[in-house]
Amino acid sequence: MNVIEGGVAAPNAKIAIVISRFNSFINESLLSGAIDTLKRFGQVSEENITVVRCPGAVELPLVAQRVAKTAKYDAIVSLGSVIRGGTPHFDYVCSECNKGLAQVSLEYSIPVAFGVLTVDTIDQAIERAGTKAGNKGAEAALSALEMINVLSQIES
C-alpha cells in the first residue's frame, strides 16, 4: 500500500499571501503568524514570499485568481477576517469569499489555503489571531506547505 503524506519543509517554494486590509488590526497578526510559519517550518526564504493586499474579503478571490494566473507561485495563503454585524452582509461576504477561493484552487490547480476568519465577535477574532485559539494565519501557512508537498508527491 502506498501512502502519500506531505511534510511542511518546502525551502524552494514560492508563496503568495493575499490579505484583506479591512479589519487590519486582526489581519496583521494573521500575516505575522503566516510569515513566521513559512520561514520557520517551511524554510521558505523571505524573497520567495510575496504579500498582496486588497480592500476586503470579497476581493480576495479575484486577487488570488490573478496571482494564480501568473503561474509564478506554488501556493496561495488567503488571510482576512469577517466579523458578524447586524445584517445579512456577513453571510454573503463569507460565502462568496469561500466559494471564490475554492474555485481559484480548482481552476488553476494550486493550493489556496483558507486563513479567513469568519467569526461572531471581535473577541473571537482576537482569539484566533494569535491568542487562546492559536493563529489561523499560521495554520493556513502550514496547510499550504503540506499541500505543496502532497501534490508534488502525487505528480512524481
Swiss-Prot record:
Binding positions ((2S)-2-hydroxy-3-oxobutyl phosphate): G86, T87, R128
Pathway connected to this protein: Cofactor biosynthesis; riboflavin biosynthesis; riboflavin from 2-hydroxy-3-oxobutyl phosphate and 5-amino-6-(D-ribitylamino)uracil: step 1/2
GO molecular-function terms, A-Z: 6,7-dimethyl-8-ribityllumazine synthase activity
Listed GO CC annotations: cytosol; riboflavin synthase complex
Pfam families registered for this protein in UniProt: DMRL_synthase
Major enzyme class: transferase
Keywords: Riboflavin biosynthesis, Transferase
Active-site residues annotated for this sequence: H89 (proton donor)
Annotated InterPro entries: LS (IPR034964), LS/RS (IPR002180), LS/RS_sf (IPR036467)
Entry's Gene Ontology BP terms: riboflavin biosynthetic process
The enzyme's E.C. designation: 2.5.1.78
Family annotation (HAMAP family): Lumazine_synth (MF_00178)
Function description: Catalyzes the formation of 6,7-dimethyl-8-ribityllumazine by condensation of 5-amino-6-(D-ribitylamino)uracil with 3,4-dihydroxy-2-butanone 4-phosphate. This is the penultimate step in the biosynthesis of riboflavin.
Self-association and partners: Forms an icosahedral capsid composed of 60 subunits, arranged as a dodecamer of pentamers.
UniProt record similarity statement: Belongs to the DMRL synthase family.
Identification of the protein by name: 6,7-dimethyl-8-ribityllumazine synthase
Lineage: Bacteria, Pseudomonadati, Pseudomonadota, Gammaproteobacteria, Vibrionales
Gene of this entry: ribH
